[in-house]
């Protein structure tokens, strides 16, 4: 089954995929890359073969394709998953895991509420414990439309009696497991959404950022689900101070570094400050978006064509209205 979501504007980075300027960040052959970078998003046909596995350590794997990047952490008692992609990919994930371990999935952690990260939850056994931040549980139950997107994305949870919704939540921090199996969850404040969870695999020195850091480009700032332009940079700065982390799993791009994450926060801080300065100077959003260019100091970030700056416009709008 293919899912196509019609965008109101070109989505550069974020919840769905990496688009203009981040194409170089995409792993080759990745299922779920944008079809031509515009119009719609092709998540590919759900299948075991369409899931690409990247080994990060002997117990931590990254599964690409079908939506957001999924992390699989093999512990003594079972597998902890981070994010489960769009609908239809739950069973392929389960089957793919059987090539890595004979242990069952016991826990799912969702980084945020968006459908390309949580819909697969509903396809796992109801005995699997789903863990999120308190705000993300609320947003998953409300199932608000994503700001800036159009498309029919019905809740996968309402149709099956709530299977896949969070059973356990946390406010600021939560640790799951102990020793080499310990996973630490953090909520640093709103950014991409109002409930973004940062997942730290302590023994691997790896952190999953979800779409709070989807890749090197403009993120979606989903104000319908608590996202914030004004607090984005501060939230990223807090996450970048996480100790003993060397690598960062992005929401849709390649694995990056803490330095990349820190730079991403600064990039968004500069964008928002410039957008607010333009408003104060009496410019329109369209004038600001047409004139703004990525500062040269940000390597790996590119300027989309003038006709394809919809995500910049959306983010400037969020900043102006917040």
Task: Please provide the spans of the model-predicted regions.
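PEST-like low-complexity, intrinsically disordered acidic/proline/serine-rich tracts
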Residues: 22-41, 58-60, 65, 90, ...
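Bacterial N-terminal signal peptides that target proteins for export
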Residues: 1-11
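Extracytoplasmic/secreted envelope proteins and their assembly/folding machinery
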Residues: 57, 70, 90-94, 121, ...
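Active-site HxH/HxHxD metal-binding segment of metal-dependent hydrolases
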Residues: 95-177, 194, 273
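Accessory terminal helices/loops
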Residues: 14-43, 241-244, 255-322
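Divalent metal-coordination and catalytic microenvironments
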Residues: 59, 73, 83, 97, ...
